[in-house]
Each structure stands twice: as C-alpha cells, then as structure tokens.
C-alpha cells in the first residue's frame, strides 16, 4: 500500500447486520438494525470498499490462496510472507448506520527484531483515521504486520 490512502465507506445497517452474523454476534435483533452501533472490529470492513485490497480475488490474476500450496506463488518464496500481528481500535464515538466514513490510512511506526530462524523480523504499523460526514473523528485503528527477512528455517 502507498504511504497514504483515502477511502469513503458508507455504513449501512444491513452491512453491520451481516458483519455481526459473520462473527457470531446475534445480540441485536434484525428489527433493531437502524439504531444498532457497529461491533468494535467493524471499521476494518473498509477493505470491502478498497479496489486495491491485497486479499481480494481478481478474475484472471493468480492469487496466493490459503491452502498448503498457494496457487499464485511460483518458485521458491523469498520470505515467509506477512503476518497480521495486532489490531487496536480507539473509539471517540460508536460507528452507526447512516455514517459515511472517510478513512485515511498511513504508515505508522516501523521497527525490527532479530530472529534465530528467519533473520530480521520487520514490524510495520498502519494507522487508520475514520472521520464522519461532518469531518469529525470517530475512530482510530492501528494494525501491525510482521514480515521476515528470509523464509523460516524448518530445522
């Protein structure tokens, strides 16, 4: 992802309902959808509005897949790939149906640690600010990814 990216994310009651169902949250009856706040991890659903989201399958484009043998990876990998290590959200107010969020994602902190089996572990933080249709801050999300300098030794 580029250093900074901005996306628009319309929050709909049915989108919140489907998200709740997908995580096994049935606390809100379907009849109360229009007044129900989104669950805490819902802001990450902005990925559905990102045309360049790296996990999206695209017709005719090899995908790295999730099986034992990734379908879109050819040859010997140069690293172990990436790992989603952490996700944190700080809410100023709940995300509600009817909100239109503008999300600005940017690179946060980066740091390294040494690993015996994979060389350097490179940590990268992504910071996402979610602002509503009035420009007011609703939520700040921080995610940390880790990649390795080389594939992990299998010994």
Regions found by a protein language model. Give the residues of each.
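Hot-dog-fold acyl-thioester-processing enzymes
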Residues: 1-86, 152-155
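HotDog/MaoC-like acyl-thioester-processing domains
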Residues: 1, 86-155
């Amino acid at each position: 992802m580029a250093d900074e990216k901005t996306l628009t994310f319309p929050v709909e009651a049915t989108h919140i309902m489907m998200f709740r169902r997908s995580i096994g949250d049935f606390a809100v009856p379907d009849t109360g959808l229009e007044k129900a706040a989104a669950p805490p991890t819902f802001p990450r659903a902005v990925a559905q509005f990102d045309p360049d989201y790296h996990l999206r399958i695209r017709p005719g484009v090899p995908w790295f897949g999730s099986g034992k043998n990734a379908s879109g990876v050819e040859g010997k990998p140069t690293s172990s790939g990436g790992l989603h290590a952490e996700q944190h959200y700080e809410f100023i107010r709940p995300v509600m149906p009817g909100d239109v969020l503008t999300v600005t994602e940017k690179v946060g902190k980066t740091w390294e640690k040494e690993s015996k089996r994979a060389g350097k572990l490179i940590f990268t933080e992504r910071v996402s600010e979610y602002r509503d249709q009035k420009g007011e801050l609703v939520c700040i999300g921080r995610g940390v990814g880790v990649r390795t300098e080389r594939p992990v030794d299998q010994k």
